[in-house]
A protein has these predicted regions:
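Active-site cofactor/cluster-binding pocket
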Residues: 1-214, 218-220
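Thiamine diphosphate
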Residues: 2-66, 70-83, 226-322, 331-352, ...
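Gly-rich Lys/Arg/Thr-decorated short loops/hinges at beta-loop-alpha junctions or inter-strand turns
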Residues: 4, 152-155, 179-196, 211-215, ...
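Short gly/pro/ser/thr-enriched loop/turn and capping motifs at secondary-structure boundaries
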Residues: 42-45, 99-101, 118, 228, ...
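Short beta-strand segments
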Residues: 73, 93-95, 114, 272, ...
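A short helix->loop->beta-strand "cap" motif at the edges of active sites that frequently abuts
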Residues: 86-92, 106-108, 243, 292, ...
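Flexible, low-complexity linker and terminal segments
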Residues: 200-208, 212, 344, 349-586
Length: 586
């Protein structure tokens, strides 16, 4: 028996590859295993290779596995492009229809099974996925009851006949594999687990749930990969809190609607990806100038321009910090996994209202669309804090006929914020430079005072946990620094290095702007070499760190920009190279 294994299904896009992986993963989640799933797919509806890789474990996992134990292949291309992940004790279960051939250098065992032919005998080739799931069950010695329950839940609305024939396809696949088990070399059975029940969700769903838990009642957005699932989640769930979602004509309309709703006192947000954020920049500046709270979710993808819409990248960082024209107060935070996405999204809504400025939650495709185990969420962990909002009438002197000082020059830069309709709170609002009442002003002294007031709000800002750190060594050989979805690969690769006697500390940065300089500097001082891991060509995170931390003599970039996520073995191999260089320097 194994403590963990990796399973992948592959074929042509539009053939149910995603749903096949979803059925397998959901069943394993119900059996209380820990999971990490990642889909490879193209920017098209049908055609082209796609796959869904699921890592299943008796203990928590946070990264894509380096290798592959079981490959379900519906065509030859799936074998050709994935066999390099397999070992001698791995297995390929291939559809006989594809007339599969092992490529040169492929050491895995190949078993042909009539997935499509069996499905056609039952009525339709579409059920080949169920036949494959059944074969997987037999190979892994899994009871099919959980799969049968899932099939019943999935197809009950289509009638008993549809449920029955899909369960029959499942069992036919099970029997096909059972008859071939004597030929199998290797162990594909998992150890049992006594873990408590847990969730299995994509990062975008966690973001949507976090927004609702934070009290958001309005979202405006335009569909874009890989952010659309946030909007889809909100559409499905926001009515439960008497909220609404508007699909706008473009991203400019989306962000300005969100600003308007926030001005009216409703917690509101928008979500998009790089191209959409480019269109939103002027409006984000409006949020900063008018000191109107705004939460924006940016799920990064491959750029520039249309770029690689369905591939992994982290190349929007500089734009998120410096993209608007002019200087505005702005907060940029970055979750480290799906669970953190829930909590940090909740916190983002608090920050937006407390500091009256735009807050960008920076995700990436791997975190947003990757699916992973999430422990039971604590809805009371983050208290809703609305800052200096005024929702009841303001008592003013009878002879005070002037506008309310919405932009009063306070010591911390945060001014009282009456929502429209509050008696005594009338004020002017404009994107033009303004005085304390909001009226346009070009006075040099007023400009200086208002600019300093706005920027003063975030000068000392440090969120509750600006980094997620593992600083177990006072004299580390290597400090790995990353952000967003690189956490899992860094964590696992670093654990391997530590086991080999190479002392490694790690940091995932959650607060990117304003930058938590002192926290990072302390960690840097404890390491001989600092390696910044990120998915972009220029090393944007490394540049931000260099701008804020005394680190130039020990920093090294480790960038990847081919659209694929970092794997644990890449972090491990990089660490070995660095450790060798350190020894040679001594």
């Amino acid at each position: 028996m194994k403590p963990q294994l990796s399973w992948k299904v592959g074929g042509q896009q539009g053939e149910g590859i995603e749903s096949t992986g979803e059925i397998f993963a959901t069943a394993m989640n119900r059996k209380r295993y820990y999971l990490y799933g990642y889909r490879h797919f193209s920017s098209r509806i049908k055609g082209g290779h796609t796959n869904n890789k699921i890592r299943v474990s008796t203990t928590p996992v946070h990264a894509i596995s380096d290798d592959l134990d079981i490959l379900i292949a519906f065509d030859q291309e799936t074998i050709d492009v994935n066999h390099h992940e397999m070992r001698e004790d791995s297995i390929i279960l291939a559809d006989a229809k594809a007339k599969p051939v092992k490529p040169e250098g492929c050491h895995a065992q190949l078993i042909e099974l009539p997935f499509t032919a069996t499905a056609k005998e039952l009525g339709t080739a579409l059920m080949k996925n169920m036949v494959a799931i059944g074969a997987t069950s037999a190979l892994m010695n899994l009871n099919t009851n959980t799969f049968e329950e899932l099939i019943t839940n999935m197809f009950s609305k289509k009638g008993d006949k549809v449920v029955e024939v899909n369960i029959q396809a499942l069992n036919e696949g099970y029997q096909l594999m059972q008859s071939r088990l004597p030929e199998i070399d290797g162990d594909f059975e998992l150890e049992s687990t006594d873990a408590l029940p847990h969730l299995y969700m994509i990062g975008n769903d966690a973001i949507g749930l976090g927004a609702i838990a934070a009290g958001s009642q309005f979202m405006a957005a335009y569909p874009i990969t890989p952010a659309s699932e946030v909007m889809e989640y909100m559409i499905a769930n926001i009515s439960k809190v008497n909220g609404a979602v508007i699909q706008t004509e473009d991203e400019i309309a989306a962000v300005t609607m969100a600003i308007g709703a926030n001005y009216g006192g409703v917690r509101a947000f928008t979500a998009s990806a790089g191209p959409g954020l480019s269109l939103m920049m002027e409006a984000i500046g409006l949020s900063g100038m008018t000191e109107t709270p705004l939460v924006i979710i940016n799920t990064q993808r491959g750029g520039p321009s249309t770029g690689l819409p369905t591939k992994q990248e982290q190349s929007d960082l500089m734009q998120m910090i410096y993209g608007t024209h002019g200087d505005i107060p702005k907060i940029v935070v970055a979750p480290t996994d799906a669970e953190d996405a829930f909590y940090l999204t909740m916190e983002a809504f608090n920050l937006a209202e407390q500091y009256q400025c735009p807050v960008i939650v920076l995700s990436d495709l791997q975190l947003s669309l990757g699916k992973q185990t999430v422990e039971k969420l604590d809805y009371n962990r983050i208290e809703i804090k609305r800052g200096e909002i005024i929702q009841s009438d303001i008592e003013r002197e009878e002879d005070d006929k002037g506008y309310f000082k919405r932009y009063a020059l306070t010591s911390n830069g945060v001014s009282p914020r009456p929502i429209p309709g509050v008696k005594g709170g009338i004020h002017h609002i404009t994107g033009v430079e303004h005085n304390e009442e909001g009226k346009p002003s070009e006075s040099a002294s007023n400009r200086q005072q208002q600019m300093e007031k706005r920027m003063r709000k975030i000068e000392q800002l440090v969120i509750e946990s600006p980094v997620e750190a593992n600083l177990q060594h006072e004299d580390a050989d290597i400090l790995y620094i990353g952000f967003i979805s690189t956490k899992g690969a860094i964590q696992e690769g670093s654990n391997r290095l530590n086991q080999q006697g190479i002392k490694v500390n790690t940091i995932q940065i959650r607060q990117l702007h304003p930058f938590p300089t002192s926290v990072i500097q302390d960690a840097v001082n404890k390491a001989k070499k600092v390696v910044v891991v990120e998915h972009n060509y220029l090393g944007q995170l490394a540049s931000i760190i260099k701008m804020n931390v005394n680190i130039h003599d020990k920093i090294e970039n480790y960038t990847k920009y081919d659209g694929t996520p970092f794997l644990p073995h890449e972090i491990e191999e990089k660490g070995k190279i660095i450790a060798t260089e350190i020894k040679e320097m001594v």
